[in-house]
A protein has these predicted regions:
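Conserved small/aromatic sequence motifs within transmembrane helices
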Residues: 1-148
Length: 148
């Protein structure tokens, strides 16, 4: 289980969860931009602030302390492995991270395919130097976003 602050009202049925899973599965098999669906109608008070400042990710530090995540790594998966094309499974060879190469390389402007390719590139070239660069770039992006 990956910890995160709740930023949306809880879905009152499994259909919303299943709808999101299908949305991600469709993205995994397309070249569409990996933008999140609009869920602004379900935001709780402060949810937009937590999301826009990336503070909703802070509880994942618990996962890091438990050894379930790392600070830097591929994006955590939301689907069962069988929902991904075979070539994308390489991204599960590393512990998922709070931030990663995808997040600092254009995040919401990239396709799902580009996200996976960046995750795989990170796995193939990971090093302390790359991790430190990604962490520094993440901090810069979060602070810059907070000043807008």
């Amino acid at each position: 289980m990956i910890y995160k602050f709740r930023t949306l009202h809880q879905a009152n049925s499994l259909s919303v969860t299943e709808e999101h899973r299908r949305f991600v599965a469709d993205l995994a098999n397309s070249d569409a931009v990996a933008a999140k669906p609009d869920m602004s109608s379900r935001l709780i008070p402060w949810g937009g602030f937590l999301r826009s400042t990336s503070l909703d990710e802070l509880p994942q530090l618990i996962n890091v302390l438990k050894g379930e995540m790392s600070l830097v790594g591929p994006r955590p998966d939301v689907l069962d492995w069988q929902d991904y094309p075979m070539w994308q499974l390489r991204r599960f060879e590393a512990t998922p991270g709070i931030t990663g190469l995808w997040q600092v390389s254009g995040k919401n402007r990239l396709t799902f395919r580009q996200m996976v390719e960046l995750d795989i590139r990170y796995i193939e070239s990971r090093s302390l130097r790359l991790d430190l660069w990604i962490l520094a770039k993440t901090i810069t992006l979060v602070l810059r976003k907070g000043n807008k």
